From Swiss-Prot:
Binding-site residues, S-adenosyl-L-methionine: 290, 319, 340, 388
Entry protein name: Uncharacterized RNA methyltransferase lin1815
NCBIfam families: rumA (TIGR00479)
SUPFAM superfamilies for the chain: Nucleic acid-binding proteins, S-adenosyl-L-methionine-dependent methyltransferases
Key words, A-Z: 4Fe-4S, Iron, Iron-sulfur, Metal-binding, Methyltransferase, S-adenosyl-L-methionine, Transferase
Methyltransferase as UniProt keyword: yes
Species assigned in the record: Listeria innocua serovar 6a (strain ATCC BAA-680 / CLIP 11262)
Record-stated family: Belongs to the class I-like SAM-binding methyltransferase superfamily. RNA M5U methyltransferase family.
EC numbers for this chain: 2.1.1.-
Length: 457
């Protein structure tokens, strides 16, 4: 029996009490929870129920009766349609406060820990919270009689929203994407049709090295074929000298994953170079690298502050990617070991260590939950561990290993407060949470990065 007093299509007044982990407003109607995208804490609004469930209602914002002083006009023309950003309508200082609150909400929801007893610091923000993303992944679509559009899927849909400019992207990523889009249209290159499973071009991926100016273009295709390849490469070379690497990645899977397993060089170099904390890093097409290079240095500074190192420690860099975090600390410890499941990332990490003159690092391809126990069996025990997992959080096998290893210091770098809280609840058996430091890596969105210091009990 439906206990929810709200009916679909019903319109009713609501006071927004709080904002949720996805940036939506939360209010209560006859004690039932109502989620309202676009509403801000303290606002009095009129909403319309669009989805009614037993325990909650999703509603759309119809009218604002009392506006929050933190409400601003979103500068992006496709903000409400796109779904890539959730907080452009919120003043930036209020965004930072919300992100700290998102961490608190996650602790409340997923653990029995009282967040009031934790030291959760104010969020570290950006001076200029725009144009920060160094990588774009724009889907393609054919419309009308041969017109090609590029953009992002709308929130919770597979409807492409065409985007001419994205104001959180580095300008060069948009410039290259738009140029390639026009080339695809000019030469009539077949665009992938998701429903039919036909066509070739699925996605245009562009990544730039902000400090080096080197830019990589990746054609994500449905087959190894790339019609008009020679003509397009010639035009790109002539018009876009900043593009120093052009790759093709083949993804024939019917899934939402961007990349497939097969990548090959079309022109230029296999990778681009980026600089971070006075180190140089090669980035291949599939390798993970933080999307906001400006805040990445702030993030790593917070990791550095968290760890107490004398120079005699062994350090594990789990989910190491191209080796950025571990190599930033290599000069402060006896040995760094890192692992990652993407072979190209490990190749990049090894090459980066050589390039940076670092010889006390060791890298291995594999899952962190498999590799760490293997190392322990071989007699290696880390004094400190840094984990920087994907949004899904740490694998339960890795959590088990971390509890067995009992490293003196554990720094958890998280991009998802919900999975962070879930993992902290388990790690709390052997580790004490010293503090949590939110860092705003993705301004204008509801995403928050958190550096958490844990010490062995």
């Amino acid at each position: 029996m439906n206990q929810n007093p709200v009916e679909e299509g019903q319109k009713f007044p609501l006071t927004i009490r709080r904002m949720g982990i996805n940036g939506e407003g939360i209010g209560y109607f006859k004690k039932a929870v109502v989620f309202v995208p676009g509403a801000i804490t303290g606002e009095e609004v009129v909403v319309e129920a669009v989805k009614v469930r037993d325990r909650f209602t999703e509603a759309k914002l119809n009218k604002i009766r009392k506006k929050s002083p933190n409400r601003v006009t979103a500068p992006c023309p496709v903000y409400e349609a796109c779904g890539g950003c959730q907080l452009q309508h919120v003043a930036y200082n209020a965004q930072l406060e919300l992100k700290r609150d998102i961490v608190i909400q996650s602790i409340e929801k997923h653990t029995k820990i009282d967040p009031a007893k934790l030291k959760i610091r104010p969020t570290i923000g950006m001076e200029d919270p725009w144009r920060y993303r160094n990588k774009s992944q724009f889907q393609t679509r054919m419309v009308g009689s041969g017109q090609v559009e590029t953009g992002l899927f709308g929130a919770n849909s597979h409807q492409l929203v065409p985007i001419e400019d994205c104001i959180v992207q580095q300008p060069v990523t948009i410039k290259v994407t738009n140029f390639v889009r026009d080339l695809l249209e000019k030469y009539g290159v077949p665009i992938y049709d998701e429903k039919a499973g036909s066509g070739i071009i699925r996605t245009i991926v562009v990544r730039t090295g902000v400090k080096t100016g080197e830019t990589q273009l990746v054609f994500i295709t449905n087959s190894k074929k790339l019609p008009k390849k020679r003509e397009m490469l010639a035009e790109i070379e002539a018009a876009l000298p900043e593009v120093t690497s052009i790759m093709q990645n083949v993804n024939q899977a019917k899934s939402s994953l961007i990349f497939g397993d097969e990548t090959f060089l079309l022109a230029g170099k296999e990778s681009i170079e980026e600089k971070l904390m006075e180190l140089e890093f090669d980035l291949s097409a599939r390798a993970f690298f933080q999307l906001n290079p400006f805040q990445t240095e702030r993030l790593y500074q917070e990791v550095e502050k968290a760890l107490v190192l004398t120079g005699s420690e062994t350090l594990v860099d789990a989910y190491c990617g191209v080796g950025t975090i571990g190599q930033a600390f290599a000069g402060k410890v006896k040995e760094v070991r890192g692992m990652d499941i993407i072979p190209e990332s490990i190749e990049d990490a090894k090459r980066n260590a050589e390039k940076n003159g670092i010889d006390n690092v060791y890298y291995e391809v594999g899952k962190a939950e498999d590799v760490l126990p293997k190392w322990v069996k071989e007699g290696f025990r880390p004094d400190a561990v840094i984990v920087d997992p994907p949004r899904s959080g740490c694998d339960q096998g890795l959590i088990k290993s971390l509890l067995q290893v009992e490293a003196k210091q554990l720094v958890y770098v998280s991009c998802n407060p919900s999975t962070l809280a879930r993992d902290l609840a388990l790690l709390a058996k052997k580790y004490q949470i010293r503090y949590m430091q939110p860092v705003d890596m993705f301004p204008q969105t509801a995403h928050v990065e958190t550096v958490t210091l844990l010490q062995r009990r």
